[in-house]
């Protein structure tokens, strides 16, 4: 592979890594619990959860309802935000759900 082709592949990889096409979301499960996750396509991911094809946690707690989503994040920022939300007490999660990012 010549130098120009290597450079082009490197640039394309950098563009993909910096994309802000990820979102963090919160679902309310059938038992009233809250589930937090990340996805590129939140609508499709919620559909998977609703059909019992999502996370093991939500499969046994159907139905699920989307309450919150925050879009425009890189994958790494979405993972960080997901971890932050998961570490919060339920009361703080409820505050976030009522914020400007409501679904």
Identify the meaning behind each predicted range:
Residues 1-55, 59-72, 76-86, 90-103:
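GIY-YIG nuclease catalytic motif and its immediate N-terminal context
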């Amino acid at each position: 592979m010549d130098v120009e082709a290597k450079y082009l592949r490197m640039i394309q990889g950098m563009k993909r890594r910096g994309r802000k096409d990820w979102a963090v979301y919160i679902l309310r499960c059938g038992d009233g619990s809250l589930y937090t996750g990340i996805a590129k396509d939140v609508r499709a991911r919620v559909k998977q959860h609703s059909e019992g094809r999502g996370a093991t946690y939500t499969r046994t707690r159907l139905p699920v309802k989307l309450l919150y989503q925050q879009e425009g994040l890189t994958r790494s920022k979405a993972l960080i935000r997901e971890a932050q939300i998961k570490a919060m007490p339920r009361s703080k999660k409820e505050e976030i759900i009522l914020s400007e990012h409501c679904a």
